Amino acid sequence: MLKQKIKDTTAVIGILGLGHVGYPMSSLFAKNGFTTVGYDINPTRLKDIQSGKVVSELDGILPVNKKKRQEKLAEIEKNLNLTNEEENLKNADVFLIDVPTPLKENETPNLVFLENTCKTICTFLKKGTLVIVESTIYPGATQEIVKPLLEESGLCAGTDFYLSFSPERIDPGNKKWGLEKIPKIVGGINKQSVDLASSLFSKIVETVIPVSSLEVAESTKMLENLFRSVNIALINDLSKFFEKMGIDTWETIAAASSKPFGFLPHYPGPGVGGHCIPKDPFYLLYKANKSGTNLEFVEEAAAINKNMPLYVIYLVEKTLKLCNKTLRDSSFAVLGVTYKRDVLDIRRTPSKTVVTELCKISKNLMIFDPLTDETFGAKTSTLDETIKGKDCIVLMVDHSYFRENNLEEKINELSPNCCVVDTRNFIDSKKLKKSIHYKCLGKP
């Protein structure tokens, strides 16, 4: 019955969690004709979606043309019911779990949102329903956590209802690789679960890749993000060494990238942020420790990335010394709050650590980001007012806005002997006056 509903696009899709994954996913289902219920307990998030404040999160699934974009948004709105009332999920044939899976203060998995979501689904679970977990979890968590909670409904996974894990794969701000173009990995508790989830996703994405088990699907997500984590850590570590050796890390990466095989460029930066890369190593480490396995390499890489914001402060102090200035007596402008270029997301952003630590030392610090009002307690204003009269400019995020607003020209208008610390190799130092002391992370 569900198979036919999926084929006819008459299945009702319930998506729990409308964050950076759940909102685009719910919109994608609605775009493809499915009646979709988007559920989130946060009324502010719902208000932001309904007002269009976060519509940029749909860039990967909407046309660029303004008229066509508005037409597609109208289609989505027609099929998408946004709600914070559980009762509106009662008619769902498919439940997708897209809630956050953060860390506790001791850097172990915090699965409270996942657990509460499973309990909510339990209320409306019926025979023939398909439940798909997209939230990132450690290998084995669907079997250990999700399955028992859902079976409190009195129904049996794999017999009475279907259970699948399909890791979310989304790159916020990436307009080339929108959700529809990213291959979808699908694992399940049995073949029927895999087949149903695969047929569902084939309705909204170009490529579906079934795998043999829930654990393989869970591990795929871990491997993808750990690959990035350890390679970013490698280049972050090397960049410190190259700096001391008088070697330009960025030029070295560009040269190595000319090799047509066996090399994938990663770039140094002020630390990792967002919903996955800073967190996922600790999910895997938790599971590894439980199984008596030591993943020293993964642990070391996570530590290197976590400490990069403090290295930025070291570079700031070092650059100020060239101007005979100290951290305590200097004024600062920090440019960029979000965790990466041209996105709204501030979760686990390295900027928070840099701002917090500098505020402990200096009472004169301002922060500016064109995409968010978050300042972590610091003062903010326009870009011009933020950098005006400051001893040191710290560029944390390479937003397109800074290029479009001629950041180099604005810096040149500042007083001589100003310092600039560029953590993204973004500023064109050749355009800066010689009186400006410029330092780029990864360059001598």
Regions found by a protein language model. Name each.
Residues M1-P444:
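Structural/interface elements that position substrates and couple domains in central-metabolism enzymes
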